[in-house]
Design a protein with these regions (language model features):
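Juxtamembrane "helix-exit" motif on the non-cytosolic side of transmembrane helices
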Residues: 51-60, 112-122, 179-189
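Internal transmembrane alpha-helix with an interfacial aromatic "cap," most often the third helix
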Residues: 17-25, 51-62, 67-102
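Non-cytosolic membrane-interface motifs at loop->transmembrane helix junctions
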Residues: 59-70, 125-133, 189-200
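C-terminal transmembrane-bundle signature of multipass membrane proteins
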Residues: 145-218
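Hydrophobic transmembrane alpha-helical segments in integral membrane proteins
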Residues: 1-16, 133-143
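Hydrophobic alpha-helical transmembrane segments of multi-pass membrane proteins
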Residues: 9-15, 32-56, 75, 169-185
Length: 218
């Protein structure tokens, strides 16, 4: 039953990623549309890769999936950054700085992946399970990013025009994701890979889209 739940999570996230991409192209303001398209695509690629690990009959192709298996560690912080910007409701702050952050985060991710060796295990319930030698470093990198964003959102609660309800959603979601990652670092895994955090943030970004009007500047 646990493996069935894992497959359902993967398929749900893949479907929701396609749905979210479509909504992003329809309603997002131009200044964040390209950014969100890139980040949501990271979610999509990662979960297609995880689903392929479940159904592949040969391990030959798994080495090509290495760069996308851990994309959640950068996709979640990057999407939190975008959601925070929207809920801040600042007319002065430019979103272009987020593209700089995106570039730096992606470069660090590429570096960690490049220096990591891949090991493959076979699971009766989950198919192939691929791990990298620097997995703990990847989790720590993600935790640092999420920790910074958590502090930022707590600070933003005092801003006069900020969407405080939305920011509270972000804070609670970040705490849930960080707890999940700490539990995994402690060696406790319900599923072979974390999937709960991605689902939470895909749902939140769709709530953000509900606040966008189609008539906004595109």
């Amino acid at each position: 039953m646990v493996n069935f739940a894992y497959y359902m999570f993967l398929l749900l996230i893949i479907f929701l990623s396609f749905f979210t991409l479509k909504r992003n192209l329809e309603v997002s303001p131009k200044k964040i549309k390209i950014y969100l398209t890139f980040v949501i695509t990271l979610f999509l690629l990662r979960h297609i890769g995880l689903f392929m690990l479940c159904i592949l009959q040969s391990s030959n192709i798994i080495y090509y999936l290495k760069p996308i298996i851990y994309l959640n560690h950068i996709a979640m912080p990057l999407i939190v950054l975008a959601i925070t910007y929207v809920y801040l409701r600042s007319e002065v702050l430019k979103f272009t700085g987020s593209y700089v952050v995106l570039s730096i985060v992606v470069l660090i991710y590429i570096y960690i992946i490049r220096i990591s060796k891949l090991t493959i295990e076979v699971s009766q319930n989950y198919g192939f399970i691929a791990d990298i030698s620097n997995e703990n470093s990847m989790y720590l990198f993600s935790l640092i990013l999420m920790g910074i964003l958590l502090i930022l959102n707590v600070i933003l609660l005092d801003k006069p025009y900020a969407n405080k309800t939305g920011i509270w959603f972000i804070i609670v979601s970040i705490v849930v994701v960080m707890m999940e990652e700490v539990i995994i670092l402690g060696g406790i895994k319900v599923f072979p890979y974390s999937v709960i955090g991605e689902l939470i943030f895909l749902i939140i970004i769709n709530f953000v889209f509900n606040g966008f009007k189609r008539s906004k500047m595109n």
